């Protein structure tokens, strides 16, 4: 087996499809994926590629490259159970911050694999568009440039993959944009207008960069595909789960109802709380994340947005 993809959700299936154009791919998931994989495999076979096969966890461990697409909140437990070789070549495609330990993805992973064997996938993309073969540009961040290029060379013809360093900047950008995307959904749901939305996203990008710079993230990362690119996509599209959370909150629905109706994981909800606690610990100014955290805890949506526009 060349590439093992862990995670049977929409994102995991999309990545399995993407890597399946050029490579033998197996997907590992607890759920039955026979029906979801049928259309994807039909498309791969029509291109002359091998179909994706679902396998169990034990068989999935014997691969050249590993792609991880599971919720960040379960990532530590997953690593504990998977028992990957310490030198396994891993690409993490999960965007968020672990709430329990206030840990970034790379901090979780370093307890289980060699940091030089780790890559992080960032940039603007939606699973629904990838499975249609629509073009996009992504970034593979790693301290190991050769490994980043190895993963980049495995991507399909419709994805332009850049290899860059600054793994901390890439993962913070990927996590933080989900937070701003919720606020973007609220802004649109309240019909506050294009000017307010532009102000929100611009200040959101500044806030993201400020937070990331504290931990060593590079400015160019936040101004590129991993930061600005992913932010502008996620905060403006109904295809974004986090954006849809914001739309629901704008209708004065309780968060529990919004998440139940969503039926999928929106990483930005828990990431918001993690960011606020980290920012409080280190004295980082995060007005948008801080106000959004109050909104998620039940503050009036109109009051939150009014306060946010004045503060951000």
UniProtKB/Swiss-Prot annotation:
Gene Ontology cellular-component annotations = cytosol
Do you know which SUPFAM superfamilies this protein is assigned to?
6-phosphogluconate dehydrogenase C-terminal domain-like, NAD(P)-binding Rossmann-fold domains
Q: What is this protein called?
A: Glycerol-3-phosphate dehydrogenase [NAD(P)+]
User: Where do the annotations place NADPH binding?
Assistant: 11, 30-31, 95, 127, 241, 265, 267
In which pathway is this protein known to take part?
Answer: Membrane lipid metabolism; glycerophospholipid metabolism
Report the PANTHER family cross-referenced here: GLYCEROL-3-PHOSPHATE DEHYDROGENASE (PTHR11728), GLYCEROL-3-PHOSPHATE DEHYDROGENASE [NAD(+)] 2, CHLOROPLASTIC (PTHR11728:SF1)
Q: Which GO terms describe its molecular function?
A: glycerol-3-phosphate dehydrogenase [NAD(P)+] activity; NAD binding
Which organism's genome codes for this protein? Helicobacter pylori (strain ATCC 700392 / 26695) (Campylobacter pylori)
NCBIfam families for this protein: PRK00094.1-2, PRK00094.1-4, PRK00094.2-1
């Amino acid at each position: 087996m060349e590439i093992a993809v862990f995670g049977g959700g929409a994102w995991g299936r999309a990545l399995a499809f993407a890597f399946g154009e050029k490579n033998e791919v197996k997907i590992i998931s607890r759920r039955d994926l026979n029906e979801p994989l049928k259309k994807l495999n039909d498309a791969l076979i029509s291109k002359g590629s091998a179909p994706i096969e679902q396998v169990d966890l034990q068989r999935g461990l014997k691969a050249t490259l590993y792609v991880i697409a599971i919720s960040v909140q379960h990532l530590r437990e997953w690593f504990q159970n998977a028992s990957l070789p310490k030198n396994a070549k891993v690409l993490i495609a999960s965007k968020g911050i672990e709430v329990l330990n206030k840990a970034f993805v790379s901090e979780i992973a370093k307890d289980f694999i060699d940091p030089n064997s780790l890559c992080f996938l960032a940039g603007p993309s939606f699973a629904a568009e990838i499975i249609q073969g629509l073009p996009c540009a992504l970034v593979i961040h790693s301290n190991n440039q050769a490994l980043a290029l190895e993963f980049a060379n495995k991507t399909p013809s419709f994805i332009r993959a850049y290899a860059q360093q600054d793994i901390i900047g890439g993962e913070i950008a990927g996590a933080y944009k989900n937070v701003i995307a919720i606020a973007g959904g609220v802004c649109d749901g309240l019909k506050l207008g294009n000017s307010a939305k532009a102000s929100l996203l611009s200040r959101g990008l500044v806030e993201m960069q400020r937070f990331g710079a504290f931990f060593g993230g590079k400015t160019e990362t936040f101004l590129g595909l991993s930061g600005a690119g992913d932010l502008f996509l996620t905060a403006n599209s109904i295809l974004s789960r986090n954006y849809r959370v914001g739309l629901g909150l704008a209708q004065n629905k309780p968060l529990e109802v919004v998440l139940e109706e969503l039926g999928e994981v929106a990483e930005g909800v828990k990431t918001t709380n993690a960011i606020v606690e980290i920012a409080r610990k280190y004295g980082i100014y995060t007005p948008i994340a801080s106000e959004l955290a109050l909104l998620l805890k039940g503050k009036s949506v109109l009051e939150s947005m009014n306060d946010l526009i004045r503060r951000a």
